[in-house]
Amino acid sequence: MDNGKIALGATGVEIARLTLGGNTFGWTSGPEESFEVLDAYVAAGGNSVDTADVYSAWAPGNSGGESEKILGRWLAARARTSGPGRDEVVIATKVGVHPEFRGLSPENVAAACDASLKRLGLDHVDLYFAHFDDDSQPVSAMAEAFSALVDAGKVRAVGLSNLTAERMREWADYARDHSLAAPAILQQHYNLVERKAFEGEYMPLAAQFGMVTESYYALASGFLTGKYRWAGDIAANAARGEAAQRYLTPEGLAVIDALADVA
């Protein structure tokens, strides 16, 4: 792994070039397997772990927060052993779609942050994302709410995910004009089979405001690994394969073939 770190503006937060996503923790990965993945990631030089309060509410028997709880247990366990200290691991989580904390009203953002901190067993998170937009809220209210968490010491840096480029620009403009904590990173869907929006809208926006860019679904839900080439491949992995089905097109398979040629 490239051990070089990327600074999130002037926030003091630095993240690895490859962030570990925690959306499977408590879903397809139990505590023991999740701990093994986290240990291996840190041992390889990684320092940033991404989760969300909603992970993994969609799984039968879950209610949301399972990933945060596992991550919190891992941090606590490593603090009791020779593992990495809290300051060595950048923790990112998100707000907006947890069943009990839907939306980005100031009251909800504050309450959801406190709930996430409790599950994680922390007094602050390094990076707090608006997970999805809330059209019922003006951007000004959301920007104020996130900045207030930074002022309170509960959040070190603000991130935006799944907002339109226009709403992100409005947020960044408002934060700059009102001396608030500015969004330091944007996280959007981006991979070799879905490039247009990220390259055409979000990358120029990030450059304009000095935001770091981070992609999710970088492997297109596993499609870019080449393991999904037929409908039968999708059916054989029902837990994860269904999300990759939309890429199973002649265009998508052409990308797989081109990738195989250069891999």
Residue positions per predicted region:
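A short acidic, helix-capping loop that chelates divalent metal ions and anchors anionic groups
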Residues: 55-60, 98-102, 224
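Short, acidic/polar
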Residues: 30-41, 104-120, 168-173
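Short, well-ordered coil/turn segments that N-cap beta-strands
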Residues: 13-18, 45-47, 83-89, 122-126, ...
